[in-house]
Curated annotation (Swiss-Prot):
The encoding gene: ylmD
Protein name in UniProt: Purine nucleoside phosphorylase YlmD
UniProt KW keywords: Copper, Hydrolase, Metal-binding, Oxidoreductase, Transferase, Zinc
Function: Purine nucleoside enzyme that catalyzes the phosphorolysis of adenosine and inosine nucleosides, yielding D-ribose 1-phosphate and the respective free bases, adenine and hypoxanthine. Also catalyzes the phosphorolysis of S-methyl-5'-thioadenosine into adenine and S-methyl-5-thio-alpha-D-ribose 1-phosphate. Also has adenosine deaminase activity.
Organism: Bacillus subtilis (strain 168)
Entry GO MF terms: adenosine deaminase activity; copper ion binding; oxidoreductase activity; S-methyl-5-thioadenosine phosphorylase activity
Length: 278
């Protein structure tokens, strides 16, 4: 088994957060991971495990790919929930009544939402990615799991902080009980931005210099993973509560789709998290 800390490549199609794959004190088993591009039925340029219904792939192929992942964990795709991601910072709590939204038809997805969480078992949360940063959250004390989509816009709008805020203010979480994993995404070495983006980064309440490196006039390498880590720490999480994947979607063409590398015409990986009765 190949290990890509904090993920393990458990099948050609799935990277799993093994440290969370345990029963919590409320007798719920956490299933959390990130898909690769391999093992599905989609044809080029979406070959082969495309999970995005919004990229002009054949819907039937995407649904088959999603069903393949759902079946892997002995779940029904109708128990999964997807969102219409808009690069913002809206976080929504998901319950049993939301199951199936966006799973087979894009128009039924949760509207304009980039972060979702639940405290209910057998509700599986899913978001789609092709370079942006997947943020995974877990509070074993309150039995909360969540996932967020953080491109540069969602990052500067601090969607990670918004998730922590909702958990602490609405769900009674203590920041010291919240664990976060920052998943595979484009690395700083592969992600060049301009002053427009950096102006927004510099406005954040964390040090932009720790996440960016100027390479030329008005050109910067921006490490979105590190920026999200700094935001989460500023939100009350200790560094040891945050794990960061070193995997870069742009520089791993055998594993991942990349919007930037593939010039926009590509598939989507899926982040997923949920709890089953142990």
């Amino acid at each position: 088994m190949n290990t890509y800390h904090p993920f393990s490549l458990t099948t050609p199609s799935t990277l799993m957060i093994q440290d969370w794959a345990q029963t919590n004190q409320n007798n719920k088993e956490v299933i959390a991971g990130f898909t690769t591009k391999n093992g599905g039925v989609s044809q080029k340029p979406f070959e082969s495990l495309n999970t995005g219904l919004h990229v002009h792939d054949k819907d039937a192929d995407v649904v088959k790919n999603r069903e393949y992942i759902a079946d892997m964990f002995n779940t029904d795709l109708q128990s999964w929930v997807f969102a219409d991601q808009t690069h913002d910072n809206r976080v929504q709590k998901v319950t049993q009544r939301d199951r199936g939204k966006g799973a087979r038809e894009y128009h039924t997805a949760l509207k304009a939402t980039d972060g979702i969480y639940t405290n209910e078992k057998n509700v599986f949360l899913a978001l789609c990615f092709a370079d942006c940063v997947p943020l995974f959250f877990y509070d074993p004390v309150k039995s909360l799991v969540g996932v967020a989509h953080a491109g540069w816009k969602g990052t500067v709008k601090q969607i990670g902080r918004e998730m922590v805020k909702q958990w602490t203010e609405k769900e009674g979480s203590n920041p010291s009980d919240i664990y976060a994993v920052i998943g595979p995404s484009i690395s700083g070495a592969c992600y060049t931005v301009d002053d427009r983006v950096m102006d927004a980064v510099r406005a954040l309440p964390v040090s932009a210099d720790l996440a960016a490196n100027q390479t030329a006039k008005a050109q910067y390498q921006l490490d979105l993973k590190e920026l999200n880590r700094l935001i989460l720490m500023d939100s009350g999480l200790a560094s040891e509560q945050i794990s960061v994947s070193g995997l870069c979607t742009e520089s791993e063409p055998s594993l991942f789709y990349s919007h930037r590398r593939d010039q926009g015409k590509t598939g989507r990986m899926m982040s997923f998290i949920g709890m089953k009765e142990a």
